[in-house]
């Protein structure tokens, strides 16, 4: 089966949720899943379910750098090193019998210069033919849009955060 590229993007809720849902579906079909998270600390509730599945590996950065807007130059440099190392590690792992490779928030990591988009594009072009790939995040470049076979935009029309309601465990994270 030819692997395709999915891109879930936009300012609306549901990008990671869609990627998790596809991961569970693939795992349920006996597929091997590698779920990598960028810009998050690995504590989101959905990762508990993924980690419990036998044929799913979750990869996150061990260090929490906080929100990009709050990072100083030194923290951005450290984050760039850590996320670039994570990307290299998971790209290598994804070529070893993985069926579905999720790069959650990789689009945002590219936008912030924390991983090199050119590295990601080169990987997408040279990946194993059967490898299905999911990318999530806001504001993808035209290069990422062009590389994707599925492009789904999640657009916010209304969100409780706009009324001051904070993210809730088990719903938003």
Regions found by a protein language model. Give the residues of each.
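Hydrophobic/aromatic ligand-binding patch that stacks against planar heteroaromatic rings
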Residues: 25, 49, 123, 143-144
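Phosphate-binding/switch loop-helix module in NTP-utilizing enzymes
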Residues: 70-132
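Conserved P-loop
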Residues: 4-92
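Short, glycine/charged-enriched secondary-structure capping and boundary segments
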Residues: 22, 48-51, 73, 115-119, ...
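Phosphate-binding/switch region of NTP-binding enzymes
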Residues: 139-173
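Hydrophobic anchor at the start of a short beta-strand
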Residues: 33, 133, 151
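Conserved nucleotide-binding/hydrolysis micro-motifs of P-loop NTPases
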Residues: 39-42, 64-65, 107-108, 139-142, ...
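Conserved D-loop beta-strand region of ABC ATPase nucleotide-binding domains
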Residues: 136
């Amino acid at each position: 089966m030819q692997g395709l590229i999915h891109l879930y993007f936009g300012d609306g809720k549901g990008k990671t949720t869609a990627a998790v849902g596809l991961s569970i579906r693939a795992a349920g079909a006996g597929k091997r899943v590698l779920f990598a998270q960028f810009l998050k600390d690995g504590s989101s509730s959905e990762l508990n379910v993924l980690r419990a599945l036998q044929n799913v590996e979750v990869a996150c950065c061990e260090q929490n750098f906080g929100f990009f807007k709050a990072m100083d130059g030194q923290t951005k440099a450290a984050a760039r090193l850590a996320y670039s190392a994570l990307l290299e590690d998971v790209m290598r792992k994804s070529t070893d019998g993985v069926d579905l490779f999720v790069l959650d928030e990789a689009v945002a990591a590219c936008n912030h210069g924390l991983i090199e988009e050119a590295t990601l594009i080169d990987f997408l072009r040279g990946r194993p033919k059967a490898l299905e790939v999911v990318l999530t995040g806001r504001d993808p470049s035209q290069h990422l849009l062009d590389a994707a076979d599925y492009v789904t935009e999640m657009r916010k029309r209304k969100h409780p955060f706009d009324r001051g309601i904070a993210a809730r465990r088990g719903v938003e994270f």
